[in-house]
Every structure is written in structure tokens, then in C-alpha cells.
Amino acid sequence: MSGQGPQRRLLGSPNATSPTTPHFKLAANQTGPRCLEVSIPNGLFLSLGLVSVVENVLVVAAIAKNRNLHSPMYYFIGCLAVSDLLVSVTNVLETAVMLLVEAGALAAQAAVVQQLDDIIDVLICGSMVSSLCFLGAIAVDRYLSIFYALRYHSIVTLPRAWRAISAIWVASVLSSTLFIAYYNHTAVLLCLVSFFVAMLVLMAVLYVHMLARARQHARGIARLRKRQHSVHQGFGLKGAATLTILLGIFFLCWGPFFLHLSLMVLCPQHPICGCVFQNFNLFLTLIICNSIIDPFIYAFRSQELRKTLQEVVLCSW
């Protein structure tokens, strides 16, 4: 894709150079504004991708190993790990192939490179869509477990969870294929941006509602213990901080990428928007960082999963 769209690293992009250290660069055209461009070294990009791969492989292995983790909640977490794993693997693969082509170690015709790039882009886009979907699915699952605790196991059954998981993967593959095929069409870009906004709003509404319920529960306990003010205030600050971190990381890691897509629709030729387009590889790096952070937010907080993870790591040595 061009510099105004999601860049195809194999075919060249404004950031497709090979710096050895990250740096900030001010670039200016004769008729345009001075732009702050953040160059991401290929070594750093590959290293972050490999860290994400290792983390998410361990999460998937731990869930597969421990039968106590074979429940809808952990299946959603496992699928999120698979999605993040695919995000990292496909980006690392694309960067590695790009470096081989640039170094002359991989000789291929332009048509072959184009086809390979299309396949990798479909995988990247599909894994991103599925990752967002499973973040939303985890939020819905947690919401149901709190507000429908007595009926939760009859509502969220394994067959229903597997149907939801299958639907998410199918929808992700189809939507990513359409996106890569018609990425220049405004309607496709608007659909992707709208999808991100919908996921952000869904997660914000559900988690804020869950926080309100938890604070209400804490007030009830505080009344019984006659320490209402201190307990309620402490819990409120802790809950608000957790919610801010969860939604803040989601927005900071995914927001720039979808801002990029929004500007492709709103101002594809504007010089200031062009400054944003030049940092597309930085936005991809933020998504890789999100894949690294997700296991700490959703998986590693589980004591059962951490225990199984230790067993997996010890068995591998």
C-alpha cells in the first residue's frame, strides 16, 4: 500500500529503511510543513515481535496443558493470545522477508513479492480484527460473570463459546480479505474505523458498569464493617486506576493505527496528514507492544495460569 495507506513494507515505504538506532527526524517538503518522523529500527521491531511470540505461545501452551483452564473465559484469553501471536508472527515475517529482499539474499519477481505481500497483509489485518474481537468478547464474558453470576454457566456454555470463537475467526478472515482487496475504498476504511470505535465504546461501557457494581458491593461490605469511607475510597481509587490502565493501553496502542485510517478518508492529500502517514511503522510497533502487554493484563493475573506457566517453562528446560 502507498504511504497514504497501510504501507506494504515489502514494496517499500517511507519508513522501510534499516536504521540501527531509533531516532526522531524532522522532514519538510518545500511546500509542506516540517514533520516529526519516528524511525523504528528493524532490529527493535523484530525483537519486540519475538518477545510477543514467546509470551503468547506460553499462554496458549499453559491453557492447553491445564484442564482446569478449559473454560469459556480461558478459551477467549487463549484465542486473544493466538491473535496477538499472529499479529507478531506476520509482522516479523514481513520484516524478515523485506530485509532478505533488500539484501539480495532472496531473489523474487515483483509479481511473486506482490502476492506474498498480499497474503501477509491479509494475515496481519485478520489477526488485528480478531484481536479486537476477542478483547470485546473477554469484556462481555466478564460482564456476564458479574451481573448474571447465578446464570453465567447456563448462559456462557462451551458450545456457545466455540460458536462465538468460530464466528470471530471467520469474520476476521473475510473482513481482512475485503480490506486488502478494497483498501482504497472509503467505505471499507470507514467500516474498520467504526469497528474500532465500537469496540472501544463497548469495552468502556462494560468495564465502567462493572466498576460501578464493584464499588457498590464494596460500600455494602464497608457498612457491615463500619469503615465505609476508608474502604470505599481505597477501592474506588484502585478500581479507577485499573480501568484507566486497561482502557488507556487499548486506546494508546490501537488508536494511532485507526487515526491513520481515518485520515486516509478525511485528508489523504493534506500535508499535515502526510506527516501522520510517515509514522505508520511506529503505529504497527505500538500494536506489537499491545500484544506484549495483553498477557500481563488478561492472562498472567490468574494464579492457576501462572502456576501452569511455571510448569511449562520448567518442562521446556
UniProtKB/Swiss-Prot annotation:
Pfam family, one: 7tm_1
Protein name: Melanocyte-stimulating hormone receptor
Membrane topology type: Multi-pass membrane protein
Lipidated residue numbers (S-palmitoyl cysteine): C315
Function, as annotated: Receptor for MSH (alpha, beta and gamma) and ACTH. The activity of this receptor is mediated by G proteins which activate adenylate cyclase. Mediates melanogenesis, the production of eumelanin (black/brown) and phaeomelanin (red/yellow), via regulation of cAMP signaling in melanocytes.
Similarity comment: Belongs to the G-protein coupled receptor 1 family.
Positions on the Extracellular side per record topology: 1-37, 94-118, 184-191, 267-279
Transmembrane residue ranges: 38-63, 73-93, 119-140, 164-183, 192-211, 241-266, 280-300
Subunit-level organization: Interacts with MGRN1, but does not undergo MGRN1-mediated ubiquitination; this interaction competes with GNAS-binding and thus inhibits agonist-induced cAMP production. Interacts with OPN3; the interaction results in a decrease in MC1R-mediated cAMP signaling and ultimately a decrease in melanin production in melanocytes.
Annotated spans, Disordered: 1-23
Record carries keyword Cell membrane: yes
Consequence when changing C125R: In allele Alaska Silver (EA); darkly pigmented animals; constitutively activated
Residues on Cytoplasmic side: 64-72, 141-163, 212-240, 301-317
PROSITE patterns: G_PROTEIN_RECEP_F1_1 (PS00237), G_PROTEIN_RECEP_F1_2 (PS50262)
Residues linked to a glycan: N29
Keywords attached to this entry: Cell membrane, G-protein coupled receptor, Glycoprotein, Lipoprotein, Membrane, Palmitate, Receptor, Transducer, Transmembrane, Transmembrane helix
GO molecular function, one term: melanocyte-stimulating hormone receptor activity
Top-rank taxon, per record: Eukaryota
Annotated localization: Cell membrane
GO cellular component: plasma membrane
Coiled coil residues, start to end: none
